[in-house]
Amino acid sequence: MWQVKRALSGQCQTLLGVLLLSAALIIHSAQIGGAAKAQPRLEPGVGEVNSAEAVNENGRGNVARRLPRSVFHVRWNPNEKFVVESRESPAINSSKLAPHPRLKVSKNTKLTLSPKLYLCHDKYSELCHNKTQQFRQRIVQTFEKSMSESFNDSQPNPYHVDYKPVFGDSFEEQYYPSTCLVMEAGVRVLRRKDKPFDKVPFGRLFPRQKLFRNIKNIKTCAIVSSAGSLAGSKLGRFIDTHDIVMRFNHAPTQGHEVDVGSKTTIRVVNSQVVTKPEFDFAHAPIFRNVTIAAWDPGKYNGTLEDWLTSADYDLFSNYEIYRRRYPKSRAFLIDPHSVWRLWQTLQMFAGNRSIRRNPPSSGFIGLALLLPHCPQVDFVEYIPSTRLNGRCHYYSKEMNAACTFGSWHPLAAEKLMTLDMNTADDMSVFQFGILRIRRPDKLLCGFNFFGY
């Protein structure tokens, strides 16, 4: 009897040992599987977006890690088209159509830094990481300096700006998320039902359509600045993969496709371009077959009735000619009240530092117009990269650092606020020239500073 009990005890011990061993093997397998799933996925850089080659600066094909939040990622799915076709016919344009607008810029035309000293491409190199951080610091310092020098009480106030903080000293407005501030500015185009346009013949010129078609299908948008640092960037293919591509004024694509792409969905144009004869807004091919969003600031507290009779530049005459010439065109006017609400967001972001009492630039207006419609916006060369060369535009040879760092528009405040909204890594922004902004969740926003 004792021998039987001993045999049974031995069998139980053996079975228990087998169970423990099996459990250990299962746990070990799970750990290996989890580690495999946690293995970071390599994201290609700019060169790979353009050439589809996964080889970095030092010739290494396989790299063990990646920098987080990289803008550049290619989904290798043979069933997907890499280049997304435009829903609009491409604009036929040329840099020879017209000279660039005459803007008020500073006399300081020289760069105060040497960007080439910070240029690198190996995002896994510690040296490149350090160079990128140093360049970022120099750029931010330059913007901060420009902001500190941008305003004094003796400067003219042609737009009669009389800003009062929403909450005075009792609330730190600058702590509110920047993306929410931009969204809540509500930059919009005027509609036929808006007063006083619902009762005047001019209002019938406004298109009945919405600003963008098929909004539910819009996933990614690119805003292409006109910066001189786009020259030689080879970002054209990357730009053209986006569902919506926004450009400004008369910035051409023809002859610059490798750097800026060929696709154009919408152009944001200022009232100078609409008005001045050298731009030939009503007839130039560059303004056809694309959506147009034209803007003029008007006075800070002026009414729309005042704006109709005293716009900065009388864009209404040429707008009417354009709409009557092309009745099926999608040409809109941006609400000037919303432009000044956007200026208020910049002042909120700046806090106790006063910014220039001039309207935001077309670039910042374009961002605010696009962000509510697009989950992800890539802003190309708005924040200068190490390709910074001092040129105003990629299509001209004019040299003036004020085009980048600001002198009339509150450009420094705009770019610091845009950097605050950025979700891409520093390598993407300061080496490759791509800043990424994601549309905020509605639950994050909703404070409604402006009460409109």
Regions found by a protein language model. Name each.
Residues 2-452:
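Metal-ion/cofactor- or nucleotide/acyl-coenzyme-handling active-site neighborhoods
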